[in-house]
Amino acid sequence: MRRALLLAALLACAPPAFADRLKDLTTVAGVRSNPLVGYGVVVGLSGTGDGNSQLTQQSMQSLISRLGLSVETGDLKAKNAAAVMVTADLPPFLKIGQTLDVTVSTVGQAKSLKGGTLLMTPLMGADGEVYAIAQGNLVVGGLGVEGKDGSSLTVNIPTVGRVPRGGMVEKMVETPFLETDHLVLNLNRGDFSTAAAVAEGVNRTFGPDVAVALDGTSIRVRAPADPAQRVSFMSLLENVEVDPAPPVARVVVNARTGTVVIGGTVKVTPAAVTHGSLTVRVTEDQRVSQGASVVVGNNATVVAPGEPVVTPDSQVQVVEEPAKAFVFDPGVSLSSLVDAINAVGASPSDLVAILEALREAGALRAELVVI
């Protein structure tokens, strides 16, 4: 009897089939990356810089003046330098002195950043504060060459490069992770049923009234006040497994490529579909005939070859395919519908037209998204 009760308890606590971890379904409110941006100069280019760009010349003059040197803008040539924008994402909890990757993109007429070096560039957040400093040698995956006759060859994008670990954090971003007595989990895809399932799964693991669903996206979870315990609690929380609700029935159609993505819960009501197609073919051809010229002389007539004559020949052909009819039983899946349409050789455009018509008729039990 005791073994039976223990087995029943273990089965009750076991995660449901096809369950997902909370770390795959949710994010913690306030724990996110922050975009950084800065303006800088890349030097050391092999003649592929901005040339006589006034913006780059002024930037170089300002940079040189900060080093204690005085130079006129007209004396600077930007053939080996380029004005660039530097961007990066500052991950949460990154500490002062740690590094991050930065992306460098040209803003002027530079043809390539290959072989360049990014000079010290402050990276600012949306509040105007400097959070990191970027500097280092660029890694450029593209290639761009140009001949003296004006011919050029470009492979990939040579005007964008990266500096691996080229940014150093100078200021941390404060997060509310340790400031309140609770955490808020936000679903990646809002759904009331999934929010309720998450709250139920957390309460089943940590005890009643620990989590409560605020709406279809957010779930509030009580957390320990001690920072050390909160980190351990979060490591357990993000590994709680729940069974998310089935997604909303949705059909996504790419009208340009004919790609159709169908959710597993999509159904159609009883419907009859008739669809025919009209094909118009226009062919252009040219007929060439040898013209003839007549020469009369000495009581004789001579026919000599003349200039070739080109005559256009256009043909228009209209082909109307016989209409094809489909009848579907109640509750048939949309995948069966698509299989039936494809079996008769319908084109992707025909499939898109049929799906849109089913939606307008109210026979498609799903949201149709056309991209």
From Swiss-Prot:
MF-aspect GO terms: structural molecule activity
Range of residues in the leader sequence: 1-19
Database matches in Pfam families: FlgI (PF02119)
Coiled-coil ranges per UniProt: none
GO BP of this protein: bacterial-type flagellum-dependent cell motility
Alphabetical list of InterPro entries matching this protein: Flag_FlgI
Subcellular location per the Swiss-Prot or TrEMBL entry: Periplasm; Bacterial flagellum basal body
Keyword Signal part of the UniProt annotation: yes
HAMAP family for the chain: FlgI
Subunit text: The basal body constitutes a major portion of the flagellar organelle and consists of four rings (L,P,S, and M) mounted on a central rod.
Function noted in UniProt: Assembles around the rod to form the L-ring and probably protects the motor/basal body from shearing forces during rotation.
Protein name: Flagellar P-ring protein
Gene: flgI
